[in-house]
Design a protein with these regions (language model features):
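Short, well-structured N-terminal submotif of metal-dependent ribonuclease cores
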Residues: 1-35, 48-60, 103, 116, ...
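Short hydrophobic/aromatic patches at helix-to-coil boundaries
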Residues: 64-65, 122-127
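Active-site neighborhoods of divalent-metal-dependent phosphate/nucleic-acid chemistry enzymes
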Residues: 55, 67-112, 119
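Generic structural signal for small/hydrophobic residues in well-ordered secondary structure
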Residues: 6-7, 43, 73, 100
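Residue-level signal for well-ordered alpha-helical positions
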Residues: 15-16, 46, 83, 120
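General small-molecule cofactor/ligand-binding pocket signal
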Residues: 34, 70, 122
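Active-site flanking residues adjacent to catalytic metal/cofactor-binding acidic residues
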Residues: 4, 41, 110
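A generic structural signal for short hydrophobic patches within well-formed alpha-helices
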Residues: 9, 40, 77, 114-115
Length: 127
C-alpha cells in the first residue's frame, strides 16, 4: 500500500512528471495508491490562500485519477503518540505520517523534513 502525502498528491494532480523515474514505476505498478482526507483539506486551504493552483476542481481531479481515500481513524491519530520525534512538525504532516505508519504503508513524499526523519517506510518521490 502506498500513501501520497500532500506534496505528492498535488504533484500527481498537477504535474506527475515531477516524480522521479523510480516513483513513476512504483506508482504505475502499485494497485493500492491512497491519499488522506487531511491532504485534501490542506490543498483546499492552500488553494484558497493562493499558494497552490490546480487546473480543475480538486474533486474532479481526485475522481479522474481513481485514487483510494483512507478515512482518518482514531487509531491513526493515536499513532502520533508513538512518533514523538514529530511533535514539532506540521500537524497535517503528523497525521499523514501516522496514518501511513498505522496501516503499514509506504509514504511517498518530496518533503525534506519528512525524509530526514530516516524512517524506512518513507520514500522520496523525486527518485
Amino acid at each position: 500500500m502506498l500513501v501520497l502525502d500532500t506534496n505528492a498528491l498535488f504533484s500527481l494532480l498537477s504535474n506527475p512528471n515531477q516524480f522521479g523515474k523510480k516513483t513513476q514505476r512504483l506508482l504505475g505498478r502499485a494497485g493500492d495508491v491512497y491519499f488522506s482526507p487531511v491532504s485534501v483539506f490542506e490543498i483546499a486551504i492552500k488553494e484558497m490562500l493562493g499558494k497552490m493552483k490546480l487546473s480543475h476542481p480538486l474533486g474532479d481531479l481526485l475522481k479522474e485519477h481513481e485514487l483510494g481515500s483512507l478515512p482518518l481513524r482514531v487509531e491513526d491519530a493515536l499513532e502520533t503518540y508513538y512518533l514523538p520525534s514529530l511533535v514539532r512538525h506540521d500537524p497535517f504532516d503528523r497525521l499523514i505520517l501516522a496514518t501511513a505508519k498505522s496501516r503499514g504503508a509506504v509514504l511517498i513524499t518530496s518533503d525534506r523534513r519528512m525524509l530526514d526523519l530516516g524512517f524506512d517506510w518513507i520514500f522520496d518521490s523525486t527518485v
